[in-house]
């Protein structure tokens, strides 16, 4: 259901057939995995110009995701994620938060706390920043503890190939796999 376009969004195009198919396959897979009590993980190996950003938002929309975390290995893609969300009519009311620059910039955790919890929130950050560890203590960076405390409806890894096989990424994924195995054994 659309509103009166109070945000003056200008884009109103539909998904292309290949995007619809990717979203449909992912939704079906997620449904089957959840029915079996597993956490779904799905990789889109799509060519450049496929429209993965727009299709990922459409997936989030169809999942009725209210809290979406986008982690990227390539922070330069932030503008594309922000523009797709903030200009398309389908995502009216959705909020985009990210690390901002400048002396007046609010920290991302403050932006999250100030966001309207009644509307979908997309939180964008770099994998290196959000999931990195404090070099002195080896623990979670204090400014990002909140990211790990939220039960995200959907987590998207963008530009996965730029860093997925680095030691920090492998260690994190191994830790997550062990935690999930422990939950399934319970």
Regions found by a protein language model. Give the residues of each.
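Walker A/P-loop
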Residues: 34-59
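Conserved Walker A/P-loop ATP-binding site and its immediately adjacent core
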Residues: 54-58, 62-93, 129
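Short basic/glycine-enriched coil/helix segment immediately N-terminal to the Walker B
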Residues: 35-39, 116-119, 136-153
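Conserved adenine-nucleotide phosphate-binding loops and their immediately adjacent elements
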Residues: 2-15
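N-terminal pre-P-loop "Q-motif" helix
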Residues: 12-40
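Inter-Walker segment of RecA-like/P-loop motor cores
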Residues: 90-138
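SF2 helicase catalytic motif II
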Residues: 127-129, 145-186
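Residue-level preference for the first positions of well-ordered beta-strands
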Residues: 41-43, 67-69, 120-122, 154
């Amino acid at each position: 259901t659309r509103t009166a376009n109070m945000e003056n969004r200008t884009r109103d195009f539909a998904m292309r057939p290949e995007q619809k198919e990717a979203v449909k396959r992912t939704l079906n897979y997620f449904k089957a995995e959840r029915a079996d009590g597993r956490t779904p993980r799905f990789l889109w190996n799509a060519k450049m110009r496929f429209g993965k950003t727009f299709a990922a938002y459409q997936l989030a929309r169809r999942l009725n995701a209210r809290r979406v975390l986008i982690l990227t290995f390539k922070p330069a893609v932030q503008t594309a994620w922000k523009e797709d969300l903030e200009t398309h009519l389908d995502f009216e009311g959705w909020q985009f938060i990210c690390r901002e620059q400048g002396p007046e910039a609010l920290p991302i955790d403050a932006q999250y706390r100030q966001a309207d919890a009644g509307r979908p929130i997309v939180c964008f950050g770099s994998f290196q920043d959000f999931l990195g560890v404090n070099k002195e203590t080896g623990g979670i960076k204090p400014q990002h503890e909140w990211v790990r405390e939220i039960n995200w409806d959907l987590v998207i890894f963008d530009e996965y190939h730029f860093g997925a096989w680095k030691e920090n990424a492998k260690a994190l994924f191994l830790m997550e796999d062990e935690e999930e195995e422990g939950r399934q054994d319970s």
